[in-house]
Amino acid sequence: SRGLGDVYKRQGTCDGMNEKGLVASLLFLPESVFDRPGDTRPVMGVSIWTQYVLDNFATVHEAVEELKKESFRIDAPHMPNGSASTLHLAITDETGNTAVLEYLDGNLSIHEGKEFQVMTNSPRYDYQLAINDYWKEVGGLQMLPGTNRSSDRFVRASFYIHAIPQTPDAKIAVPSVLSVMRNVSVPFGITTPDKPHISSTRWRSVSDQKNKIYYFESVMTPNLFWLDLKKIDFSPKAGIKKLPLTNGKIYAGDAVKDLKDSDSFVSVSYTHLRAHETL
């Protein structure tokens, strides 16, 4: 694809938007089970699952039609630091169509439709929807669950995303969505080693799919910045660019001018991780 992606520690793509306005976002889900007994299908590493979607599809429906064939299996061994790479994927396109993809007991579960506007972490999506239905009956103006648990954050996000102004004006829509994301973020410094799905929020991103602008906010820096895809040269001769976010780098506003030449990242591979596990 020609587009943008958040590359976590040079190990894989966790979030991004391609030039067609398709957005893919990967989040932790402890209930994920990718393996099937005796599965002999070709293997795709979980670290490139998001990038595969961004590289190959322009719309959610295109992606769903191909992915539901389950022509490959996802390999998701433990990371070098010992944490499980149990994840689920949300994709959305510029029409507003969305799909949430989860591997449960080795089988791909897909929820597709414009009504699916929120994804957090645990529990699995069908259970999460049932919890949210209960809170809809309670009514968000009366009471909302307020803990850092992902199921509570889902309920709050689901209520507030419908309460904010529904407008095509990006100057209102982007900060409105960010206000919801900040409300459901886990404060920095909170750690629960045995429950990574309720650990601190490290960043927030908003994708303006109609105007092709990708907004990013790190909890370690004071400013919101963005990249306008319309201003970036995506021709092969332009090569790969990156925006370094480590070592105290701070950006504000349009950061296209700050892009640097880069090599392609090396995704975490099955063999690389197995080598770590046997040390």
Region roles according to the model:
Residues R2-Q11, T271-T278:
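Conserved small/polar residues in nucleotide/adenosyl-binding loops
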Residues G5-R41, I74, A252-G253, D258:
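A contiguous strand-loop segment
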Residues K20, D55-H61, A170, K210:
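A short, structured loop/turn motif at beta-sheet edges
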Residues P30-S32, G106-L108, M220-L224:
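Short, surface-exposed beta-strand-loop junctions and turns on beta-sheet-rich folds
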Residues P37-F72:
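Compact, glycine/acidic-enriched structural inserts
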Residues K69-L108:
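Catalytic cofactor-binding cores of redox enzymes
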Residues D75-P77, A84-S85, E94, Q117-R274:
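C-terminus-biased signal that marks the final domain/tail of proteins
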Residues N97-L101, D105-Y127:
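Aromatic-residue-lined binding/catalytic grooves and analogous aromatic/hydrophobic interfacial grooves
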